[in-house]
Amino acid sequence: MNEEFEGDVPMSDPFLSLVTKLDDIAPFPNNDPLDFDMEHNWQEPGPSQQPDPSIPGNQHSPPQEYYDIDGQRDVSTLHSLLNHNNDDFFSMRFSPPNFDLGGGRGPSLAATQQLSGEGPASMLNPLQTSPPSGGYPPADAYRPLSLAQQLAAPAMTPHQAASLFVNTNGIDQKNFTHAMLSPPHHTSMTPQPYTEAMEHINGYMSPYDQAQGPSGPSYYSQHHQSPPPHHHHHHPMPKIHENPEQVASPSIEDAPETKPTHLVEPQSPKSPQNMKEELLRLLVNMSPSEVERLKNKKSGACSATNGPSRSKEKAAKIVIQETAEGDEDEDDEDSDSGETMSQGTTIIVRRPKTERRTAHNLIEKKYRCSINDRIQQLKVLLCGDEAKLSKSATLRRAIEHIEEVEHENQVLKHHVEQMRKTLQNNRLPYPEPIQYTEYSARSPVESSPSPPRNERKRSRMSTTTPMKNGTRDGSSKVTLFAMLLAVLIFNPIGLLAGSAIFSKAAAEAPIASPFEHGRVIDDPDGTSTRTLFWEGSIINMSYVWVFNILMIIYVVVKLLIHGDPVQDFMSVSWQTFVTTREKARAELNSGNLKDAQRKFCECLATLDRSLPSPGVDSVFSVGWECVRHLLNWLWIGRYIARRRRSTTKPVSVVCRSHAQTAVLYHEIHQLHLMGITGNFEDTYEPSALTGLFMSLCAVNLAEAAGASNDGLPRAVMAQIYISASIQCRLALPNLLAPFFSGYFLRRARRHVRRAPEHSVSHLLWIFHPATRKFMSDAKRLEHVLSSKQKQLRFGSFVEDEQLSPLARIRTTLKVYLLSKLVQELVGGDEIFTKNVERILNDNDRLDDEVDVVDVSRLLVTISTQCAAILTNEKDESAKFGTWISRNGDACCTWWTHVLTCGIYWRSNKNELARQHYSLIRNCPPKILTDNLGLAVGHALCARKICIDDRDSPKVSQYVCIHTKKSLESLRLFSTSSRASGVVSGIQEGTRRMAYEWIMNSLLDAWRSNLFASKPYWTQSFKGQSTFSTLYQEAYNHYAIINGTRGDCWRLFVYELTCRMLNGANPQATWSGVRRVRSTKMDAVRGRVSMRRSAQPDAFHLHTLVKLHTSMDL
């Protein structure tokens, strides 16, 4: 195709032809640097993948760029390389690594990372920035160093500043540009020991100025001027490489006054007594922590003689051990002798056993003296100097005194808090509370903290824990409610009153005598007794019910007013609650749902509340919340719950407390809906009764707080009602669930209508008929909300949101609506046969009518970003609505416009389809990384060109370009991993749509190159083979994904077209077209049945009939 058509589409804007006419698009023989190579890497989006056009450096030349940081080239350096045939680079058989990977655009690798010291990296010398103060050194003056010295030790003289970069030659290469410095020979990697004593210069070791005096020459000058006679002494050294070889370098004994330093024997003291005194003085001056570290150190001891006269006597030796570079031990600072060694060298002194025992006794004596002094000081403070107390009595007296002082402090703090509240209620200024630090924080570091022996007594003196308070309050409320139910059901007072009346009537009734027969006419006693009995029973029953009503009112008031704790916003417990709640919300935002639920439960315990235990407690708790909601519906419960508790807790404080508690219950209920219980056991299943209790608690407390400045915003109250509606749909039976779920949803709708539009725009999709139909299936809703489901792979269709129930419902609703659009576009539901996620059910598959405009607008509404910032005006610290914001979904919006445009094209509504072109062109970055998205986009561009740019001479060129790109993307997508379930059905539907657009575009562009006056089989044009090849590939792939069903007339029409483009017999093609046309007419008349997905493509059938008009005789 490249030989026939010139130009290409830019990958930085691949869908440019959607909003631009083809005549206005310039050819693209050379793409912009921001675009990709369309022939090789066009499927990889993003301009950052473009390779760097800079030419890499020559890796086989000596690393002059590495030595010369300024990048200068000097003739003398090249001359030095050419003249020294014995140079190390001359014998090098490999190229040194190029550390400047950034091409000069950033810091080099050698400047930012440490070298390992192995391989070719150990032969390269680090750069140096400070000039040396000596004379001009020779080029081959090389001294091997250890790896730690090469990387850390600065090469400097006492007269120069410190340098951060050191080379192993000790020469500043920046200032000596007239000499080429050679690295060490690559056959030797074993550094030799140094004979000079290392000096500390600004915290670093300098190995280059050891033999140089204040005014003397440098070491290298001495080495090359007058080397004295010497003898070789070999000493073991730690090796860097595994295979060491001999090094061809100057000997280390050439310098004068060389001494071996690897094993140092100290000079013996004048007498053993002096040595012992010095050791004891050293141990006494050491701190206890240093002594402990000294005792725990492990080292080997070596023996040596201390002179010819005392050869058999043991003496202390000092052994130098070199530690590894990366060993970071905090005890390396202190040696056994109290001296600090440098460069990881530790001096270990081994003393005789008698001396060590003496040191231990001194340390123990020091401890005992310190303890006795402190106990004596305590006794003087408590009882005076004359008192006689033992150590235990003194400590016991001190503990009792401390407890008494703490108790007094608690009482004083309580009084101060009450006075502060009184001043606050009277609106008088009051001082801020003083924060006192603990004694342990003010104590010195050296003193070891005493164990908290009075912790148990302090806990007994304090009040009970919030969890116990909440459990006790909850059980008391359940008990009161149980008593209320018992009074209403059994009426024990009425039974007692009835039994008393019956016994009284029985006592007053006359006793019939067996000897008396007959009756007395007009006896007044029976009538009067009966009248008095009825009058007495009515009066007595009224008394009983008045008493029952009074008891009910008492219980209700007790439960509503005194049963709900009101929080004090100035207390310490409230500050603890706020801190724990913020931590829980942070865990929730990070995705740690279980830990967030545990912290929310801790917040509930801090507010003196608790969740009911499974069983009878849950049943009575849910029953009481139902009764309370009935009272709230009658406005009796709201009026009683908002009453002022005390002077310090007015109505505003009560409403704010109820609002905060309602939001807390709502947040716990949100996680409970997703299957998070807050327990450590994963096998614990969430209870439906517990969910009902939390939802009803949130609703009742929200109604008690009210939708006011001191209460909750209407958007938050609407979301609380929505969660209660979802819980009723999940927990209640099928007969009761629709009624109660609809009841709470209507109350939420009422708050949404009264709230400002900008604050509730993120909740409007809940009340759409399609959403209500989606949420009517309890099993599907439970599966969507469950956290134990597998991670759904939605591909590039929607953004996956899993942090709240509404977010999960919104995500799956997007997939549900996209599947409805794909069903409408493809014309069948066979692609959704495998339904694993339960997003589609049987009723959804039977629905063939889809309101495209309604579904498209709903999808765009759901996918639009909306962040509602809701804050309580009077309480700035109590912020609501931070979890109700909604992020935008650009991918879902893009797919919605693409599918809607395809449906409009299928219905011949081209004007409505043009309204989506500009929105489709603004492709999200995630679509550019998805092969299916790119394929559909290019196929849509090709179809748009054939529909709207038919008169342009570039139609064939750009149709071939876009179809080729689309087929390449579809080929890559078929080999990549795909999703399953309903998402897989959406992918298959969009693939079919892309192949159909490709074949329609190719047929339309092929026909535009023909003359209508001649038969098509007698004509040929440039690029005809390109159309037939591309169409053949598209048809083959479409046949594979469509299956081998015999009743698919659509596939048969595509096969006829493919044969026609490849030069088949026109007579056979025409006979097949006549057969398809007759079958379609029979389906229209109702003689045969034909599925929507099997109906022939109208454009293909019409084009085939037009091309074979001359044969229709």
From Swiss-Prot:
Location of the bHLH domain? 355-405
Which Gene3D superfamilies does the record associate with it? Helix-loop-helix DNA-binding domain
**Got any disulfides in this one, which pairs?**
none
Tissue expression notes: Broadly expressed, including many cells in the head. Expressed in the intestine.
Q: Locate the region Disordered.
A: 24-68, 101-132, 206-274, 290-345, 437-472
Record's keyword terms, sorted: Coiled coil, DNA-binding, Endoplasmic reticulum, Membrane, Nucleus, Transcription, Transcription regulation, Transmembrane, Transmembrane helix, Ubl conjugation
The disruption phenotype is: RNAi-mediated knockdown causes early larval arrest and a pale, skinny appearance; paleness due to absence of dark, lipid-laden fat granules from the intestine. Decrease in body size, delayed growth, fewer eggs laid and 5-6 days after being laid, many eggs hatch inside the body. Exposure to oleic or linoleic acid returns body size almost to normal and also increases number of eggs laid. In normoxic conditions, reduces total fat levels, but has no effect in anoxia. Reduces the increase in body width/length ratio caused by anoxia.
Where in this protein does the record put region Transcriptional activation (acidic)?
1-52
- Return the SUPFAM superfamilies for the record: HLH, helix-loop-helix DNA-binding domain
Read off the Pfam families from this record.
HLH
Which residue ranges does the record annotate as region Helix-loop-helix motif?
369-405
Which regions are flagged for Basic residues bias?
229-238
Q: Where is the composition biased (Acidic residues)?
A: 324-337
Q: Which domain of life is it from?
A: Eukaryota
Report whether Acetylation shows up as a keyword of the record: no
PROSITE patterns named among the record's database cross-references: BHLH (PS50888)
Gene Ontology terms: cellular component: endoplasmic reticulum membrane; nucleus
Q: What does this protein do?
A: Transcription factor involved in maintaining normal fat levels. Regulates the expression of genes involved in lipid metabolism in response to nutrient availability, such as the fatty-acid desaturases fat-5, fat-6 and fat-7. In response to a high-glucose diet, promotes fatty acid synthesis, elongation and desaturation, acting in concert with transcription factor mxl-3. Plays a role in synthesis of monomethyl branched-chain fatty acids (mmBCFAs) as well as other very-long-chain fatty acids.
This protein is called Sterol regulatory element binding protein sbp-1
- Which species does the entry assign this protein to? Caenorhabditis elegans
Q: What is the lineage of its organism?
A: Eukaryota, Metazoa, Ecdysozoa, Nematoda, Chromadorea
